[in-house]
Amino acid sequence: MTLLAQLPTVRGKYIEAAPLKGLTWLRVGGPADVLYLPADESDLCRFLAETPDEIPVTVLGAGSNTLVRDGGVPGVVIRLAGAFAKTEALDGYRLRAGAGALDKMVAKAAAKAGIGGLEYLVGVPGTIGGALRMNAGCYDQETSDVVVEVIALDRMGRRIIASPDELAYSYRHCEAPEDWIFTGAVFQGQADDPDAITKRMNAITARRETTQPIREKTSGSTFANPDPPGTPNQRKSWELIDSVGGRGYRVGGAHFSEQHCNFLINDGTASAADLEQVGEDVRARVRQQHDIELRWEVRRIGRVSGDQKQEGQAG
């Protein structure tokens, strides 16, 4: 029996052997056995409730911080878009956003509604679902600072509403169960002038453009900093990478950026194995020279191929 034959009837769309490299910013990797595009939350709920437990399920957002391995992704890859990308301004300077909404579009929706405090999202690549899962942030602000309610579905299709305290957020991490699929959230801001908000957003964008290789095929920050923001004498991943000769280090078509050496770059010819090898080589150097274990911030999913060494997947 084929995988598709084992899946429930849905209102959304299934695509067999779906190419994924075009759905990620690094532009590498093999196909999904099946790609599922749910019509809405109830459609996704039914899919989860009726899909056999032994079939792997993986969620893919904008693919901004995801490396799909060359062997492709087993089971079903779920991509949240359409109905999951909506935003809505609420009373009390709150904003509701679907998990498939791009972070920068949420920032713009908040600005238009005169809701301040969410402008940092314009500097965070990816979608709200990823921001919720990894407590994404930039420039001394993170998602846990502004989220007040999270909506998710578990692997059985049950709808869950959770508070930030229940998720026990910490630096680039949350304690939500791995099988939860975030479908949306509510954010709390404060009254502010839309023009003033937009000015701050433009400053964040300009800062990123001068310090990060955002025009390249990259996945953003490769490794989380060893210490959270505010730590005295905070150790930063880029400084550690630079200290071991990682700036510009290359394997095949993959290298660490000369502009910001915590950014992996695909020059257009890299394989997923090249990119992962560059990261692992530099991690090994940092471990050997500084006795520090850098933690992947890039989420690596799928099967390895050929002789590529299997590493633990990180979110």
Curated annotation (Swiss-Prot):
<dbReference type="Pfam" id="PF02873">
    <property type="entry name" value="MurB_C"/>
</dbReference>
<dbReference type="InterPro" id="IPR016169">
    <property type="entry name" value="FAD-bd_PCMH_sub2"/>
</dbReference>
<keyword id="KW-0131">Cell cycle</keyword>
<comment type="similarity">
    <text>Belongs to the MurB family.</text>
</comment>
<dbReference type="GO" id="GO:0008360">
    <property type="term" value="P:regulation of cell shape"/>
</dbReference>
<feature type="active site">
    <location>
        <position position="172"/>
    </location>
</feature>
<keyword id="KW-0573">Peptidoglycan synthesis</keyword>
<protein>
    <recommendedName>
        <fullName>UDP-N-acetylenolpyruvoylglucosamine reductase</fullName>
        <ecNumber>1.3.1.98</ecNumber>
    </recommendedName>
</protein>
<keyword id="KW-0133">Cell shape</keyword>
<comment type="function">
    <text>Cell wall formation.</text>
</comment>
<keyword id="KW-0961">Cell wall biogenesis/degradation</keyword>
<dbReference type="GO" id="GO:0009252">
    <property type="term" value="P:peptidoglycan biosynthetic process"/>
</dbReference>
<dbReference type="InterPro" id="IPR036635">
    <property type="entry name" value="MurB_C_sf"/>
</dbReference>
<feature type="active site">
    <location>
        <position position="297"/>
    </location>
</feature>
<keyword id="KW-0521">NADP</keyword>
<dbReference type="GO" id="GO:0071555">
    <property type="term" value="P:cell wall organization"/>
</dbReference>
<dbReference type="GO" id="GO:0005829">
    <property type="term" value="C:cytosol"/>
</dbReference>
<dbReference type="InterPro" id="IPR003170">
    <property type="entry name" value="MurB"/>
</dbReference>
<feature type="domain" description="FAD-binding PCMH-type">
    <location>
        <begin position="27"/>
        <end position="207"/>
    </location>
</feature>
<dbReference type="GO" id="GO:0051301">
    <property type="term" value="P:cell division"/>
</dbReference>
<keyword id="KW-0560">Oxidoreductase</keyword>
<feature type="active site" description="Proton donor">
    <location>
        <position position="221"/>
    </location>
</feature>
<keyword id="KW-0132">Cell division</keyword>
<dbReference type="InterPro" id="IPR036318">
    <property type="entry name" value="FAD-bd_PCMH-like_sf"/>
</dbReference>
<comment type="pathway">
    <text>Cell wall biogenesis; peptidoglycan biosynthesis.</text>
</comment>
<dbReference type="InterPro" id="IPR016166">
    <property type="entry name" value="FAD-bd_PCMH"/>
</dbReference>
<dbReference type="Pfam" id="PF01565">
    <property type="entry name" value="FAD_binding_4"/>
</dbReference>
<keyword id="KW-0285">Flavoprotein</keyword>
<dbReference type="InterPro" id="IPR006094">
    <property type="entry name" value="Oxid_FAD_bind_N"/>
</dbReference>
<dbReference type="GO" id="GO:0008762">
    <property type="term" value="F:UDP-N-acetylmuramate dehydrogenase activity"/>
</dbReference>
<dbReference type="InterPro" id="IPR016167">
    <property type="entry name" value="FAD-bd_PCMH_sub1"/>
</dbReference>
<keyword id="KW-0963">Cytoplasm</keyword>
<feature type="region of interest" description="Disordered">
    <location>
        <begin position="214"/>
        <end position="236"/>
    </location>
</feature>
<dbReference type="InterPro" id="IPR011601">
    <property type="entry name" value="MurB_C"/>
</dbReference>
<keyword id="KW-0274">FAD</keyword>
<dbReference type="GO" id="GO:0071949">
    <property type="term" value="F:FAD binding"/>
</dbReference>
